[in-house]
Amino acid sequence: HMPPTEAKRDYMDFMQAFVAEKAKVLVDIIHKHGKQAYVFYDDSWVGMEPCGERFQSVGFDGLIKCVFSGFECRLCAYAKVPVHELRFHPYLFPVGLNGTPTFSEGGTPEKDAVRYWRSVRRALLRQPVERIGLGGYLHLTQNFPAFNDAIADIADEFRTIKQLHKNGAPYVLPIRVAVLHTWGKLRSWTLSGHFHETDKHALIHINEALAGLPVDVK
């Protein structure tokens, strides 16, 4: 599971302290002007891990997490912030991460959206978030009505899931699963990056399996 060295943990602790201190100043400025401050946890999250002991001290109003998989949904929902938002794939770009067409000739973004949603949905049934969204260039969707229809269906399912959670907590088997590794709480529900970036490591497969199972995970 890519265990850290002592030197790396010391460096990360130093960076987390530095980033939290500087970020708090910026968040205070935002709040001073009556606005809310959200953090986008993905492209560059050095020092900003949501399960880190300093994350709450920054005072963010929400966390936005780009998701491919169920464990990423649980990571977002697990963070101690008022609002949790998932940023769905595919992104509204002409090509995907692997260079294949998405919102361009030959692309089938509606199939991509449904495939990712299946992984996300099973996790959301266990633990909810407040909001969902997309990122990229909105005008690219104009020539892909099947994608727009798919997103409308996904949004309806998401609203249903939110309502189910409001009606009551999901059933949980009398089973507690503990995940223990050298990262400790810092890497709760994650390892390093997305599933396709770390799929050679057993921990990410364990996290993804647990993300949608009706068990108590610690």
Describe each model-derived feature in a short phrase.
Residues 1-218:
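Glycan-processing catalytic domains of CAZymes
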